[in-house]
């Protein structure tokens, strides 16, 4: 039997009982003695006795008609009542908002402590993207909001780094975090990499050209450079110049990638080519050294990617080309600093291995000067695309080691092209992002209309405190309203004094804006998609089992970044440990201080 038919039969069974009952009433009235209505009513008792002498229904036409008519009338009355019934939700008239409990978060916690993202003192989120019950699956993208001094680093970044379950890409304003957690990561056999745009001497080298594989990669690199070096007050009238610059950069980088020797594939070569691209307004036939390079390449490969781009650039007249070159020079002015050119001369980052083995990459940037933040943005953009491509092409869609981006001061990194699309697709590839801001307005200032898309792709929101009005308003609205009881008392004074008492239901925000702004500094608000919000204590890092390895617990655990980089470079220069007896080799003696020798032994 079909479920719908079965449901209708069950629904109408009570009306069959009514038909039976009223059929018996009709039978009793029919069997009662008497010639008229009054006489039958006097003997109705005898009629009921006769009718119910047998439990079998009466099949007399009159009795059946009375029973069926009564059942139909009752069904119509019930239908009318249901259709016009008032909908009462007692205790829920204005809202059902409430704070979450331990039972609400329990399905989302992994029993193994290390396999969780730490959110608050009592709430955690399992790292697995495939829980036993699919309805409990949540992405690991987290939006963390907290004003200055609210503890974004202490209460969120450090606890989650101490979990040691993933590779980490960590933005580190001021460069203090690596010193505090580096010793812990080294003990756990993590490969540590650092890009420092504050002090280049304390940084490993990063060369974006080392990660160019296809023409698409070249276009992405050019786009990231354009987006993050446009300067202040860019006007729509500059569109032509920007497009012309894009063609020029694409042509030069394409030439370098496909034609230059390995040691010349870097920004230094790009700058040298731009500097050699002089023009003469009075001589349209003048050929500079770069023109000659492309002429020779065109003779050999007319359909070369770089040649196609350069042809389009060369459509500009001499005066226009000179203006384009001036724009290029202004855009790449930071590369006039020798330390930056040296930093990006070759690569030590090994970005394409971060999803293969546990790695911690620290991106140190200034929180007061954004001059070199475009370097961080280029790396972030390249890394995200590299990881996604490797997951798809090598590992069948999922990286073997989960990669977590912990992006402190996210608003200061610069704009990562297509980030709104990337954050929507990285979950399935075992990549997640924790976006840390001082207020939501920072995100809107950079990503504008795409800011809401980015927020919408974060299943978790953690508010650590702040007083920015827009943020307070949005959080208060998200928390919703609860229904509360209220009563008013009144007193009327006249010839006689009378008192009144009035009870009513009211709707109240679970937490008003002023309550959020003035909440205790040790408390936070957690919102997980599909779950009631939590008002909980911030995570106490001193209770973490690995806290003792941080410099917070013991200054002896302070990580020496310069020494680590120096030792890593010396190790790379050492000859291979295993050489065949017949294999010729050169032997180099490298002097290490006792301190450096101990450092290597510790690894």
Annotate each PLM feature.
Residues 423-525:
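Conserved ATP-driven motor cores of ASCE-family P-loop NTPases powering translocation/secretion/packaging/pilus
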Residues 51-54, 63-116, 215-225, 272-276, ...:
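Short alpha-helical interface patches
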Residues 113-119, 374-382, 475:
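Conserved long hydrophobic alpha-helices within structured protein cores
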Residues 21-27, 135-431, 446, 451, ...:
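P-loop NTPase motor domains
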Residues 20, 99, 241, 487, ...:
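A residue-identity detector for tryptophan
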Residues 106-108, 113, 374, 410, ...:
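A short glycine-/small-residue-rich loop at the edge of a beta-strand within enzyme catalytic domains
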Residues 1-150, 154-157, 481, 492-493, ...:
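Basic- and hydrophobic-enriched, low-structure N-terminal and domain-boundary segments
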